[in-house]
Amino acid sequence: MIPNIIHQIWIQGYESIPSELRKYHENCLKINYGFKNEFWDNDRIRNFLKNNFEPEYLELYDKYKIYAQKADFARYAILKIHGGIYLDMDMVCRKNLGDFLGLGFFFTAYKLKNVFTNYLNGVIGSRPNHPVFDYIFKNMFLRQNDASNVTNSTGTKLFRDSITEYTKNNPTNDISLIDSKYLHPCNLYNDKNCPYTCTDCYIAHTNYSSWAPHLKLCKIFFENKYLIFIIIIIIFIILILLWIKYKFNKS
């Protein structure tokens, strides 16, 4: 059983949460009545690691320089000890997550136009002391020298590799991959209103991407893809006309 606790992290502290994300956070508290909310910042995380893990865990946490890596490491540690449901701060909550508390461990998959699939670590539910975390921490320590690569060292690739390794070694397990229509219905290429119009969703990711500016650019591209396509066509036509003019003048 997963405890009815929702964990959220903002390394810089509560007062530093952007106003847009704070609205999402407050809405999630209202939607998920009956849940205990736990907010974690850097100071609380460091004290937690110091009191619940061997010294090398805090050392590795401090070694990470990117906030996203610290948040990744912290969510795994928090869920290992306390259990509960972890949510990224840029999640819009639509339905109470109590329906998932009967599971042992759950997550969902991220898909990009059937070209790219990865396991999303922005929403994770777990009972305390789930053995999959042994694999996750083992791999984070093994990859600590690849700290410049967020996805591989702590993020979605690390998460996927660890779950794949665990399930391969433990065919009988309580790992649940939840259909993305319930936990991640909106991708970068979806309409920006998707988090508010999805019908089956319990939560929806807004793809705020605070740690990855290139993802924000991708989001802007997909939101304006038709306008950008028209601009590209116009530029292409202008280049063709200039080339024709050049050829004509040369002859």
From Swiss-Prot:
It is a single-pass membrane protein. GO terms for molecular function: mannosyltransferase activity. Keywords: Glycoprotein, Glycosyltransferase, Membrane, Transferase, Transmembrane, Transmembrane helix. The lineage of its organism: Viruses, Varidnaviria, Bamfordvirae, Nucleocytoviricota, Megaviricetes. Its main location: membrane. This is Uncharacterized glycosyltransferase L373. Glycans are attached at N149, N152, N207. Belongs to the glycosyltransferase 32 family. One of its GO terms (biological process) is mannosyl-inositol phosphorylceramide biosynthetic process. Its EC number is 2.4.-.-. It is an enzyme of class 2 (transferase). Disulfide bonds: none annotated. GO terms for cellular component: membrane. The chain crosses the membrane at residues 226-246. It holds the Pfam family Gly_transf_sug.
